[in-house]
Amino acid sequence: MSVITDIADAVTTSLNAATFSEDFTAERLHQPSFELTELQSLHVSVVPKALEIRNASRQHSFWDCTIDVGIQQKVDDDARVDELVAFAEEIADHLRLKRLADYPLAAWMAIEHDPVVASEHLDQHRQLTSVLTVTYRVKR
């Protein structure tokens, strides 16, 4: 498989092996699209997003692989929104500053949490959508 797909798989495995405050099974997907009825339960999607290749030396390149971790669930109140935002931070804490057990060549570089809450999803559907964008670097 490709480097970015292998990293996304390793992120998925890492999330599924860890213990969090919420019960879920992360899935690697290319298009995390769900019907509202499916979102009664929590969905955590790991999506290969982008790849940027930069020069590292005359013979090597840095491959910066960006992975989105999406958190989605239909919510009834703001208290549940707060719980899921805290859950997203748990995931960020789990991934930051660590190498992936299933892809140790990938070095963690950064995490961005945007949107923390997608306001249009919350307003129109009472659905929380929160996205962590994680960047890993591989020297090749």
Feature annotation, model-predicted:
Residues 1-36, 47-140:
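Charged, amphipathic alpha-helical segments and their flanking helix caps
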